[in-house]
Amino acid sequence: MSDIVWAIKPDNDSSEKMFLRIQNYASELQQAAELNYVAKIEETANAISLNMEQRKNIYLIFKESIYNAFKYAEATEINFNANYDGNMLTIILSDNGKGFDPQKTNSINGNGLGNLHRRAKEIGATLNVKSANKQGTTITVTLPI
């Protein structure tokens, strides 16, 4: 519920505040386990104004992805990168977890990856998942701005 309240507040319309919220969530997990979380957010990515739907969906995509990396993939390292090139916001989350085969998951009809894809589609973003057994996972979201 607090995520929805945060997303609808007009004061939180900057990408910088969204990235800070993602980092705060990751920090909570980092304190609970041996998890090394590193974020690299380019200045240009911090200066974007995002609408409520964009903030909510991007935040929830990466909140779920960070949680999954921690709980299911048993990752010990998570890297979060964001950049903006003038018309495209690109956000990449990668981990060193055990990975999985995205083709063998029930991602379209079930939860998990299906939710991530649905959230990206709702805001006109593209979501790409690259993963393989014992090779970690990389989730990339690109959003035209």
Segments from the language model and where they lie:
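Conserved ATP-binding N-box helix of the HATPase_c
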Residues: 55-78
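Short beta-strand/loop element within the Bergerat-fold HATPase_c
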Residues: 77-87
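A short beta-strand-to-loop micro-motif at the C-terminal edge of the catalytic HATPase_c
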Residues: 83, 130-136, 142-144
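Acidic ATP/Mg2+-coordinating residue in the GHKL
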Residues: 95
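Glycine-rich G1-box
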Residues: 98-99
